Design a protein with these regions (language model features):
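A short acidic/basic microdomain associated with nuclease active sites
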Residues: 20-37
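Intrinsically disordered, low-complexity regulatory regions enriched in serine/threonine/proline
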Residues: 2-5, 32-203
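Amphipathic alpha-helical segments
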Residues: 2-24
Length: 203
């Protein structure tokens, strides 16, 4: 039997873990709506250039809290759909110390074993969806280390700035001014290095 991306998605949907999930074709994601937003696995995929019979799937695991994105919507240069498709935080497999890409033989050879191996995505998803299941957990893992000087800030992108500030304002408003100063100082450095995304918001 020929292995296709649609077959893999259909088989995933039969697993108990994905009960209640829906598949959205425009970004190839399995997502579950929560009270505060959504949890999702985006399944980027392509044919291997060197081995045309190999289908490569690259999962991204994300959690979104709508409240962290709402205020910035009217200022963003991105389309509303693009903004609302985005996660508040996301990970690849390697960021979790696990496998990034998973391969399937499109001829169907060894499909059962490959699909069993593919279920490593459940381990990744369970971790992300549990460890980042609330604003408090997200704050403790992403904002506190910045405030304590244990980790730095991203050198690219813009969305994270407003997500982090909104998160701090909601969870720990007493720390908002401190975080704001850290972020503003970092943004000035990004601007000095002509980071393209930052330039979109400077006159």
């Amino acid at each position: 039997m020929i292995t296709t991306f649609d077959k893999i998605v259909n088989d995933l949907a039969q697993l108990d873990f994905f009960s209640g999930y829906k598949f959205r074709k425009r970004d190839y994601s399995l997502f579950f709506k929560t009270e505060s937003g959504k949890q999702f696995i985006e399944l980027d995929h392509w044919r291997d250039r060197d081995t045309t019979s190999s289908l490569v799937i690259y999962p991204i695991y994300g959690v979104r809290f709508d409240v962290l994105h709402k205020w910035f919507e009217k200022f963003s240069v991105k389309t509303l759909q693009d903004q609302r498709d985005r996660a508040s935080i996301s990970f690849s497999g390697s960021m979790l110390g696990l496998q990034d890409e998973l391969n399937f033989d499109t001829n169907g050879d060894g499909y059962s074993k490959e699909f069993e191996n593919f279920q490593i995505i459940l381990k990744c998803a369970e971790y992300v969806f549990s460890e980042y299941s609330s604003l408090d957990k997200l704050y403790n893992k992403t904002i506190l280390p910045v405030l304590d000087g244990e980790t730095g800030l991203p050198d690219v992108g813009v969305d994270w700035i407003f997500i982090d500030m909104a998160l701090c304002k909601l969870v720990a408003p007493a720390n908002f001014d401190k975080l704001k100063q850290i972020i503003l100082s970092h943004v000035e450095k990004m601007y000095a290095h002509q980071e393209p995304n930052i330039l979109d918001y400077y006159d």
